[in-house]
Amino acid sequence: MINFNKFYKLFNLISVFLVITSIILLMFKGLNFGVDFKGGTLIELRLNDKQTTISSLRKSFINMNLGDVNIKKFGSNNDFLIKFEKKDNSSDSIELIKNDLTKSIGNNFTFRRVENVGPKVSSELLKSSVIAIILSLAIMLFYIWIRFEWQFSLGAILALFHDVVLTLGFFSLFNLEINLSIVAAVLTIVGYSMNDTVVIFDRVRENLRKYSDIKIYELTNISINETLSRTIITSVTTLLALLSINIFGGEILKGFSLAMILGVVFGTYSSIYIANSVLINLNVSQKTVLKEDNN
């Protein structure tokens, strides 16, 4: 049996350091928000042939120095939605873009729609994204508060906070773009981390009812080992799928898959070393669980 709790204090100190560092980065360096949140110009483009790839199209727009460029397929395989930071949809500016694009890929495209994404729409989108993340956290925490004792709930809260803050801190450190797909990834991370934590907590509570003579330090270690095969299988299979998306999914999915990879790694780690450490430090015992059962 692996003794996961042998170095739990050391891992706790490392986590505290990383969380504080991430918070400092988020406060003073901030996040690199993409066009979705900063506003810019939106172009709906249709290619008239199948030879031009999305990578060559992206390269052409990046070379125009338009700021952050986001290109996505929608509808048919020849339709693309292009967003970039430069806020100028005047006829002269659009004509220059058309000329540059013609030089790069030829005259085989049509601009079906051109419009500005204003700062008001972007700020509302950012506000909605923040509300979505906060609501998802609140619902998850409400669920675990009902299902488990308050000590377990506190452990889950700290584990979730740890995972989300470290993921955002990583994006801040390396100045990676934050767009709507990253928001979706963060929401998924919340669910994944909570699921991992609940599986171990469920086994801890079950073992607390069965063994009255085993201290919580040993009991959490037993519970982690009993659920280890499930944790490894779930984490490894999820990571393999995400790595495939990151390598072969193209530029559009790189940010999303990277955020998810970080979330899976942090979520697996926190369910073992953060959530369970709270139970150890609060010295949860069989009396705690039985008292709650009687209530």
What are these language model-derived features?
Residues 1-295:
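A structural signal for conserved, well-ordered secondary-structure elements
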